[in-house]
UniProtKB/Swiss-Prot annotation:
Its main location: cytoplasm. GO terms for biological process: protein quality control for misfolded or incompletely synthesized proteins. Coiled coil: none annotated. This is ATP-dependent Clp protease proteolytic subunit. It is found in: Cytoplasm. It comes from Neisseria gonorrhoeae (strain ATCC 700825 / FA 1090).
Amino acid sequence: MSFDNHLVPTVIEQSGRGERAFDIYSRLLKERIVFLVGPVTDESANLVVAQLLFLESENPDKDIFFYINSPGGSVTAGMSIYDTMNFIKPDVSTLCLGQAASMGAFLLSAGEKGKRFALPNSRIMIHQPLISGGLGGQASDIEIHARELLKIKEKLNRLMAKHCGRDLADLERDTDRDNFMSAEEAKEYGLIDQVLENRASLRL
């Protein structure tokens, strides 16, 4: 995750060995909180993957909390996060704050069943994968890329159908165009398990 260092607060902690300064995200990582903020890119995905692997090494039996505020982005980068979430031993609880769109929504749905949350004013959007950038070249190359895109679309729909507890036909229909949902609508659809009004409403 990339942030402007001038905008990231620093937390000072006192211990028997004196003072220690943490940027706020490193401090929250100690609480097993991982953030995905902004577009899903190779860089942001690598940082998330590294943090997930680190937290597993610290304690393989304790949940990890994955906070998502993302408009989506690269499918391959997102799938590296998805595969790591499934690869590691700890349960990964997901929470949407702000928005989870496209690959962000896919990752939100991929949290541990019963531990997928959204704050009440979050927006969730699902759709079919897009080709990033202009696609040019020979007709045969364009055909190859089109076939690959259809394979990716089918795979994402199958996986999301599994996570949402829905038929594949539902996902094929509902991702045909941009499909925006409120937190409550995302819960009804099966993308999340609970809308959190406040911390006291959390049920695990």
